[in-house]
Amino acid sequence: FEGQEPLRQLPWTAPKWGNDDDFVDLPAKEVIEFACGEILKYRTPAGARHLAGIHQPHPVGDGWGLQATPEGRKAGEPIPVTLSPENGTMVNGATAAFRSAAKIDPMCYQWNNCLMLQYFASVFQANSGAELFAQLVKNYFSIGGGQHQPNVVNVEDLKAAQLHPADYQDLIVRMWGVSAHFVSLPREVQDEFIARFDNL
């Protein structure tokens, strides 16, 4: 897409996963469930079953070695984490992302079916913020969702931590199923994490 920004914008502005749009979600469901079904047909030499999964825990490192992709992602840019929408494309909010993810049967990809979403800390400072969040997650599970890994942070704190890491040694974020000190992460990983808050 180098020097071809109008061309890149054509697919980039098309409907994207994570916005509760069947035009995008149902083909993804079909491909994922087909692949999982094929994997489950086979056994190891010892007779054990293979487990299928949508496992992509390293969006920055894996993105470095990947050329541009048809949806408009540039070469070397991070790729989405597991079931999560691509950074900057979740335009219909968390509820829509939950609905997209719940369309795929979580039992077909038991190894990893995590939906990682970010939330502004201010949501939880409102009177009923925690209760509303709890209900949101319960609803996700009630419609067939698998796992959900939330991150609740203040983006301004993340940016300040990049400038003054000594002042933010206790800032913890969830990355790929584990908790990490934000300031200990490489700058590229920090930048990708902050970019997850685009369009929220």
Question: Model regions: which residues?
Answer:
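Acidic, glycine-enriched catalytic cores built around paired aspartates
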Residues: 1-200
